[in-house]
């Protein structure tokens, strides 16, 4: 057990996120899909870890987020929760509700949200949509399950939109999105992700809502920011969207390490006497 794991920090809750917004403290969010990465993120002080349906892309290699299932996300979430618990236990863990796990009916959504919460003790679930899911958000929150909303570009609706372009540039769509944000708050959502919308609109929504806004490609005036951890670490050399800041080039580092390992094995340089029993 490391030193950090012996010094448990105050766990981030929905109330803590609300207080951070009121105090002008920015909220940091990253995705994670496994135990090891979750330990690193929690140790580094991340506020929220999102077990995103983006695992469908970056972990499983699918072109969209649609194929991933509830059970697959639960598998990822179990490792993430254990990783956080092994370190400071500070980070909140939010799990995406995957495509078609909440669209059929509020009752079906509640059943799936309850399964996600019960099987690995995460803190909340996240759902895409505005007024169309208002009754579902209300049903789930009334059952005691915190819900994070998601507006703007909604990857689960990619075939409806036809592209990953910026959303709500049209004034009419911007007004609808603003109304969706207000509806989510009134329905009980504790926060809302704003993805790929104009920075000015995101700033307006952030001022209007009392709950935190978490931006991804939505400007600096959101109450927090979320990115995919693989992107900030430079693990995907083909993916460089404008809204991502790359903090490392681990793709190159890992490739070089593997090449050196292969060379050492082939040359007989590994293992050495010191690495043998």
Swiss-Prot record:
GO terms for biological process, alphabetical: pantothenate biosynthetic process
Annotated binding of 3-methyl-2-oxobutanoate, by residue: 53-54, 96, 126
This enzyme's EC code(s): 2.1.2.11
Cofactor (UniProt): Mg(2+)
Cellular component aspect of the GO annotation: cytoplasm
Functional pathway: Cofactor biosynthesis; (R)-pantothenate biosynthesis; (R)-pantoate from 3-methyl-2-oxobutanoate: step 1/2
SUPFAM superfamilies listed in its UniProt record: Phosphoenolpyruvate/pyruvate domain (SSF51621)
Active site: 195 (proton acceptor)
Binding site for Mg(2+): 53, 96, 128
Reaction(s) the record says it catalyses: 3-methyl-2-oxobutanoate + (6R)-5,10-methylene-5,6,7,8-tetrahydrofolate + H2O = 2-dehydropantoate + (6S)-5,6,7,8-tetrahydrofolate
Oligomer and partners: Homodecamer; pentamer of dimers.
Entries under PANTHER family matching the protein: 3-METHYL-2-OXOBUTANOATE HYDROXYMETHYLTRANSFERASE (PTHR20881:SF0)
Record-given protein name: 3-methyl-2-oxobutanoate hydroxymethyltransferase
Protein source organism: Chlorobium luteolum (strain DSM 273 / BCRC 81028 / 2530) (Pelodictyon luteolum)
